């Protein structure tokens, strides 16, 4: 069963952010500006996105 996916793009820099926010970006596969990843739409991924919502842009794919 193919679930919904989210297109997540990093738009903010992790410089001068807390260590847990940087780790969350890495967990999402985002470690460079303007990098885009397609991730499964799960509650875990949504929680990670919410934690760094000021540094990412989310589109439904």
From Swiss-Prot:
Per UniProt, the keywords (alphabetical) are: Ribonucleoprotein, Ribosomal protein
Q: Which GO terms describe its biological process?
A: translation
Q: Which domain of life is it from?
A: Bacteria
A GO cellular-component term linked to this record: cytosolic large ribosomal subunit
Q: Which Pfam families match?
A: Ribosomal_L30
Q: Does the keyword Lipid metabolism apply?
A: no
Molecular function (GO) terms for this protein are: structural constituent of ribosome
**Family annotation (InterPro entries):** Ribo_uL30_ferredoxin-like_sf, Ribosomal_uL30_bac-type, Ribosomal_uL30_ferredoxin-like
Instruction: Give the protein family.
Output: Belongs to the universal ribosomal protein uL30 family.
Complexes and interactors: Part of the 50S ribosomal subunit.
> What name appears for this protein in its UniProt entry?
Large ribosomal subunit protein uL30
Q: What organism, scientifically named, is this protein from?
A: Rhizorhabdus wittichii (strain DSM 6014 / CCUG 31198 / JCM 15750 / NBRC 105917 / EY 4224 / RW1)
